[in-house]
Amino acid sequence: MEDIQQFLSDRVLMRYNLVTHQTEVHWLTDFGDDLQQIPQWERINDRIENTLWKELSKEKPVRMRDLQYVIGSDYVPAYHPFRFYLEHLLPWTEEQGDNIMELSLSVNVKGDSDEQFLFAEYLKKWLVAMVASWMDDRVVNNVMLVLIGPQGAYKTTWFAHLLPPQLREYFYTKTNSGMVSKDDLLTLSQYGLMCWEELDSMQLKELNKLKAVMTMPSINERAAYAHYHENRPHLASFCGTGNNVQFLSDPTGTRRWLPFEVENIDSPMSSPFNYEGIYSQAYALYRQGFRYWFDRNEILRLSQHNQQFETARSEHELIDEYFRQPVGIEGGEYLPASVILQLVGGTNMKDINATKLGRALTAMGFESKMTRGIRRYRVVRRSTSEMQQHRQLQNVDLESGGVVE
């Protein structure tokens, strides 16, 4: 075995990629014209193994199996491409400027300046969380940055160019977002960034499954080429795209999503990103203890932001049609969700029940309290005239684009 190791050391450099779980080779010499065009680093394949065995056999008889044992052993040092990239960047200092803010300005989000600043804030958290998940196997970036806008707006292209060229091969596009397969689970440990397209075409069940995948701490699956199941850390961060603004339909909450509607996006081909500046800043913030997760107040603000992206739910509409919250000194009345369901006529509706109605009342901010083991909600019933006036105000609001003079 020592002879094989010496032969390899004289001719090639090798490293074991901890992300792909494959050995890579860099040639110190070539063995003919057919190998002169090999890139600097190449994943070992049958042809390369056969070439090494052929050249080694010229010096002494050797079994292919012995060569494979050495290549698959700890003789080959381990290498983590993401950590190697980050740890070899030039250090970032505040004097160099806010490169992540500059990156955020390449995406012109719809809305006022506050919305643009919010995008910059969320992008920074998301990027630092992505770096944290690359550096620490215990960290999972469990929120998805989503860009919503028309086709041809560079949404997927922007995400595809977000990884630096040295890591570009670890970007994965999921075009059939409606299915999450075993192979998709394995990609969580094999890619640094996964882009899920057409999120707006996914059903609630599919979105919930995707949300569960986003929060998985590790993956215990057997790769096609492996002999054993392995517990692999969740490496991938998530991004997504869609065309329709209203795509969130989860009544249990939307804090896993960071959606923004875009007006336009600068082409990353015409205006390349400052990768070293962006990632050296994100890495520095991570090492400085920057809080990339959302606290309670930030989650509340995120939930308010996400309301514009939620699909209309009939239980919300029914409650808003028949009830409102007390104003001023109004006492209102405390009713259980089951009674409210009867009053709005929901007992004859297939997709509405008391549980959904209770969640909707809570989400809409109605006060509640427990009485004799039953949760009751403080509501005011709209009179017939008030219901008519409420409909008229809604129509005016729609016709004016949401602005009432």
Residue ranges and their predicted role:
Residues 288-331:
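Conserved alpha/beta core segments of nucleic-acid transaction machinery
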Residues 264-275, 332-405:
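Positively charged interface segments
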Residues 192-214, 248-253:
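Conserved AAA+/SF3 P-loop NTPase catalytic/coupling segment centered on the Walker-B
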Residues 184-189, 223-241:
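AAA+/SF3 P-loop NTPase mechanochemical coupling elements
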Residues 74-189:
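P-loop NTPase catalytic core of nucleic-acid-dependent motor ATPases
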Residues 1-95, 114-117, 348, 390-405:
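N-terminal nucleic-acid engagement/recognition segments and initiation subdomains in replication
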Residues 248-267:
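A short helix-turn-beta junction within AAA+ P-loop NTPase domains corresponding to the substrate/partner-engaging
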Residues 208-230:
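Conserved catalytic/switch belt of AAA+ P-loop NTPases
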